[in-house]
């Protein structure tokens, strides 16, 4: 039976690269594309070396672990020992979850089993042996996406709620600094784009918002013409439907900021996919905070060490 080494190598190179990318997304690591591709190439070398006199070494677990060390080092570099092991263990986790998921789905579709010498052999009509290209190319990205979303959900659940954080809102090239409260009760999102909405007191924004826009935020239902909005702010205005206790559906005036920056657990988190909703109610009687932070912002933002 002919073996298409180039196709096998290309498949492994692609899978190793996607696993490293998934690792970077989960840990929110910054990476360069050429380093990511080189890391995937290092992992795929095992396939090529399997067809050399060194093939007996390539099947040894120690060699495979050594290759994974070099893959992670090439992709993310080395800053300190903890940084390296976080990357390495997350890479193993992604490999086991996605690889195990593929194997589980593969065996789910098996309809023929044969027991030989106390070993189970399977036959896979239409799926290839053991797993067809189409099965891998479709299933692998889907399982990667599923794994990433599940990890994000776990991270949101583990966030310490009712915690005050420093917040900077960059809006129309102006920066506002304030305190924010991470509140699990704030699950408001734009229904069209699924963009999370943080709530900010109107008093915190009055220094930079035009008077007409501030008046409109008090009674959004009165909006009738686009001319009511200053053209400088028109592209930043959004209307988000929401429901409060004892009241019917209402509209909240929200703004699209240039960026929101949070300081959470010694990390600076920068978020661009966020809306700033304007509230005319008092969020904190003792004025401990001026905004309510959507918990998802902690997960979706770009993280860097706080200076």
Curated annotation (Swiss-Prot):
Q: Which residues form a coiled coil?
A: none
Residues annotated as transmembrane: 7-27, 36-56, 57-77, 89-109, 127-147
Q: Which Pfam families match?
A: Peptidase_U4
UniProt-listed InterPro entries: SpoIIGA
- For whether the record's keyword set contains Protease, the answer is yes
According to Swiss-Prot or TrEMBL, what is its membrane topology? Answer: Multi-pass membrane protein
One biological process term in Gene Ontology: asexual sporulation
* Record has Transmembrane as a keyword: yes
Cited function:
Probable aspartic protease that is responsible for the proteolytic cleavage of the RNA polymerase sigma E factor (SigE/spoIIGB) to yield the active peptide in the mother cell during sporulation. Responds to a signal from the forespore that is triggered by the extracellular signal protein SpoIIR.
Q: Which UniProt keywords apply?
A: Aspartyl protease, Cell membrane, Hydrolase, Membrane, Protease, Sporulation, Transmembrane, Transmembrane helix
The protein here is known as Sporulation sigma-E factor-processing peptidase
Q: Which family does it belong to?
A: Belongs to the peptidase U4 family.
Q: Name one GO cellular component term.
A: plasma membrane
């Amino acid at each position: 039976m002919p073996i298409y080494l180039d196709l096998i190598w290309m498949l492994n190179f692609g899978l190793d690269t996607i696993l490293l990318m998934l690792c970077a997304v989960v840990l929110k690591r910054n990476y360069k594309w050429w380093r990511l591709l080189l890391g995937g190439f290092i992992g795929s070398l095992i396939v090529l070396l399997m067809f050399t006199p060194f093939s007996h070494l390539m099947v040894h677990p120690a060699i495979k672990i050594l290759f994974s060390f070099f893959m992670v080092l090439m992709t993310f570099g080395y800053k300190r020992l903890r940084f390296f092991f976080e990357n390495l263990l997350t890479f193993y986790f992604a490999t086991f979850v996605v690889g195990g998921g593929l194997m589980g789905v593969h065996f789910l579709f098996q309809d023929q089993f044969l027991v030989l010498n106390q070993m189970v052999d399977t036959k896979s009509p239409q799926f290839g042996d053991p797993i067809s290209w189409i099965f891998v190319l479709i299933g692998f990205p889907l399982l990667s996406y599923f794994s990433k979303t599940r990890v994000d959900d776990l991270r949101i659940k583990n966030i310490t709620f009712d915690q005050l954080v420093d917040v900077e809102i960059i809006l129309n090239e102006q920066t506002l600094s304030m305190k924010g409260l991470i509140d699990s009760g704030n699950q408001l999102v734009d229904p069209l784009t699924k963009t999370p909405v943080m709530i900010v007191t109107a008093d915190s924004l009055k220094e930079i918002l035009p008077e007409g826009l501030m008046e409109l935020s008090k009674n959004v239902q009165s909006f009738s013409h686009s001319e009511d909005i200053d053209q400088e702010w028109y592209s930043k205005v959004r209307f988000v439907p929401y429901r409060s206790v004892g009241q019917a559906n209402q509209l909240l005036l929200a703004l699209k900021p240039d960026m929101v920056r949070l300081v959470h657990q010694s990390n600076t988190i920068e978020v661009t996919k966020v809306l700033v909703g304007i509230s005319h109610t008092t969020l904190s009687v003792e004025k401990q905070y001026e905004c309510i932070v959507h918990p998802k912002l902690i997960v979706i933002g770009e993280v860097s060490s706080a200076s």
